[in-house]
Amino acid sequence: MNAAVRPVSADTAIADISLAAWGRKEILIAETEMPGLMATREEFAAAQPLKGARIAGSLHMTIQTAVLIETLKALGAEVRWASCNIFSTQDHAAAAIAETGTPVFAIKGESLADYWDYTHRIFEFGAAGTEGEGPNMILDDGGDATMLLHLGMRAEKDLSVLDNPASEEEKIAFAAIRAKLAQDPTWYTRKSAHIIGVTEETTTGVHRLNEMSAKGTLKFRAINVNDSVTKSKFDNLYGCRESLVDGIKRATDVMIAGKVAVVAGYGDVGKGCAQALRALSAQVWVTEIDPINALQAAMEGYKVVTMEWAADKADIFVTTTGNRDIIRHEHMVAMKNEAIVCNIGHFDNEIDVASIEQYQWEEIKPQVDHITFPDGKKIILLAKGRLVNLGCATGHPSFVMSASFANQTIAQIELFTKPDAYEVGKVYVLPKILDEKVARLHLKKVGAMLTELTDGQAAYIGVSKQGPYKPETYRY
């Protein structure tokens, strides 16, 4: 365990409980910017729809997540929580939640060994062998919690599945699973036994769920929260539009205007990042594999290039794809002196950080590193290739996270209260009427007035006056 840890109880791992008062003040401010979550509390508090839910949460332990946790608890749930990224925790947020008695396992800058230990600990509900052992719900971001249980169950039957880790992180994760099985050979099966389902926050985690579902190996019901319109078209786009440059600026104090910035990927995240950089008068180039997205970027006025072409010309590089090996060793070797390299995709494999570990590293400040190449050229790597907006800043603004987390809360209620409506092993999205509900909850805060259809108008286009207003195939 990190030497800096001063836990409030044996069932908690945080940096410093004395930060709780600061965290509580920021939580109160965030609540005023999170109308969706607060309205959900008000609507469901009396009914307690999550009473009896034991939620294992793996999601960035930020101030905004603290509001989510307290919403889940207000609706009756019991919660255990860890961060889904070693750099994304806000220690004062973790302290504020720990002070309320919720088990929290999250420290900014925790080691990978601690990360996997903490992820194991979110499943430790109840006494062994009882009906209350383990969680009955998972709230995941990136899929690590879900993956851990599935891989652990496979390893119970065949340890050889842990024989060939593909990365340093997998090596540490696999070692943690081996150690757990040496202590308790049926731990993963027991912790999974009562799980009704999982709600997944982000693109990368949804990809993992879809892969398992297609192979027939997904053991739980799942709701894909990421593809709710009020998540992907808001958090991914508008959230990244504000938090990317916040991270770059806090880390480097660089002037964006006049720089050439490359955004790898032009999905919702890439679109938001490109808009932000252009708004600060950078010259923005985009790399893409998909001709539709590439054409979208070109029609918005961005120059569409390849990373090979751009590597020696640009000043700032941002990966947004959710894929691996986007910026490789040969790209970094070609870069200008003092080029800034960062990632805003969920995992750290978009930039081949392992390939430059052989060179000289100098930490400028936490999550900001100078890497010196053999020819003396230096690049600036942010957050060691992990999420720059959470590693070097504090993530998305509260308002946009209110929409994402209202979706999470509604998805948890859906799965927990209506399990028979969802088939084990399949991945679902929330009904459009609930997506529209989340949007409605946020309109007043931004001063928006919604026009109401007349009976004749509703009949003419064949929709209910209460919605949903668009077919499932509609792309916003």
Curated annotation (Swiss-Prot):
Q: Pfam family example for this protein?
A: AdoHcyase_NAD
Q: What is its EC number?
A: 3.13.2.1
Compartment(s) where it occurs, according to its Swiss-Prot or TrEMBL record = Cytoplasm
Q: Which SMART domains match?
A: AdoHcyase, AdoHcyase_NAD
Q: Which residues bind NAD(+)?
A: 202-204, 236, 265-270, 288, 323, 344-346, 389
Keywords of the record:
Cytoplasm, Hydrolase, NAD, One-carbon metabolism
The prosthetic group or cofactor this protein requires is: NAD(+)
The superkingdom of the source organism is: Bacteria
Q: Does Cytoplasm appear among the keywords?
A: yes
Q: Which PROSITE patterns match?
A: ADOHCYASE_1, ADOHCYASE_2
Q: What class of enzyme is it?
A: hydrolase
This chain belongs to the protein called Adenosylhomocysteinase
A single GO BP: one-carbon metabolic process
Molecular function GO labels: adenosylhomocysteinase activity
Q: How many and how are cofactors bound here?
A: Binds 1 NAD(+) per subunit.
The entry's cellular-component GO terms read: cytosol
Q: In which pathway does it act?
A: Amino-acid biosynthesis; L-homocysteine biosynthesis; L-homocysteine from S-adenosyl-L-homocysteine: step 1/1
Traced from the root, the source organism's taxonomic lineage reads: Bacteria, Pseudomonadati, Pseudomonadota, Betaproteobacteria, Burkholderiales
Q: Family per UniProt?
A: Belongs to the adenosylhomocysteinase family.
Q: Which organism is it from?
A: Delftia acidovorans (strain DSM 14801 / SPH-1)
Function of the protein = May play a key role in the regulation of the intracellular concentration of adenosylhomocysteine.
Task: Give binding positions for substrate.
Answer: 62, 141, 201, 231, 235
Q: What's the name of its gene?
A: ahcY
